[in-house]
Amino acid sequence: MTYVDTSVLAAYYCPEPLSNKAQQALQREDLLAISWLVETEFLSMLARKVRTREIRAAEGLRVLAVFQAHLEQGIYQRLALEREHFAKAREWLATFTVPLQTLDALHLAVAAMQGCPILTADAALAKACARIGITAHLIS
């Protein structure tokens, strides 16, 4: 199972420079996982693209419908955030040495505690993964 970061989903569902690479990377994986946090971040990203007129509202609704259909089809296994994920994120952040934002620390905690590598288009996140011993596959 591979944990898919929001940055990859953004490139997969919306036209971006990394869209082709995101598609190829997702097709190579057998079992894809996201957390409820990824789903929320994806919707936030989509809303931002509509608000900033990067895409039209109709396109945003189309993308959302496709993503929702994929969720309903079980393309992604949804992972819940649990108390232990917050504790693990807190542990990493308390070292003061791992350059993670709050939500990224939570993503990595979910992936780490599931024993999943993470697929990301975020170079800083991939670098943080290396610091804490999580396998990251960076698309760039």
Predicted features and spans:
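Acidic, PIN/NYN-like endoribonuclease modules and their adjacent C-terminal/linker elements
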Residues: M1, E84-A87, L108, A112-S140
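Short active-site oxyanion
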Residues: E29-L32, Q77, A112-I118
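Aromatic- and histidine-enriched alpha-helix N-cap/loop-to-helix transition segments
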Residues: L37-T40, E84, L103-L106
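Acidic catalytic patch
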Residues: E39, R62, Q68-F96
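Short amphipathic alpha-helical interaction patches enriched in hydrophobic/aromatic residues
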Residues: L46, V50-R53, L71, I75, ...
